[in-house]
Amino acid sequence: MIDECITVAKMFNGDMVLAKNRDRNYRPRLKIVRDVTSYGIEICYIVDVDTDWTEGMNNLGIGVVNSALFVKRDEKDYSKKKKTKAPSKDGVRVREALGKGTFQDCVRSLAVYHGGIKGHTLVGNGKKLVAIENTSRTKPVIKVKDLNKEPIVRTNHGIEHPEQGYQQGNDKLSSELRMVNALNVTHQTGDWRNLLPNFYRHRQDKGPKYDLVRAQNKLWTSSQVVMNLKQKEIILYLVPGQVKFVGVENNLPKGYKPKLSFRVLKYSKNPEDKYGGNKS
């Protein structure tokens, strides 16, 4: 399985925004789940119904996004030979954390619950942003980041654990280039609703496989998600032909008025269309 992602956190005019660009080598089936925990916390999250990958937010304005570090070893979502997808252990960790009643408890849960979430995790509450970096070979490094100084971007190579993740060759180059390019696009974007569409249009001179949104035979961007933690809004973007949205599972109590909102949007063009048929 190949799992390459970009996660982003930035302040947009006082609104903390988390975003994720999700690349896969299979066609995911995604759904949105609405629920209220036994403690009265409303949660809304996107889940891959085959692997249990989960990202989302709660009514306290706490959101979580994640990208992998052990791209091919720990995250074996899909085997082309067996045509099967192994469940992600991080899905239950994210849902457990989103059900917590405080930001501190949410961060603690992500760091320790069932051994702690793996990879790069960005978790924010609209005011504070915490970056967690963890693998099955290391201990988690937890740092508070000041988004008022600069945005945060993470891809698939280690920062606090530089020996982890992509380490050599085109994989390392891809991860580093995507991080630099994503940071540049993020800096240049003034409206949070334009962030991921700007990722979608991104091009650079090293060829399509290094674009932020890609359409390759072995790897392609299947979906994107952006969360405005202040406005408590989630937007899920679908890439044509690369993902299937299977609907909404609404577990909210009858008569409950949701505090969280979401939209599902589908791009009208494929990523390769930006090259006008002249891909290299």
Predicted regions, residues:
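C-terminal, well-structured catalytic/ligand-binding subdomain of enzymes
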Residues: 1-4, 9-101, 105, 117-119, ...
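Short regulatory alpha-helical segment in sensory/regulatory domains of signaling proteins that mediates
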Residues: 111-114
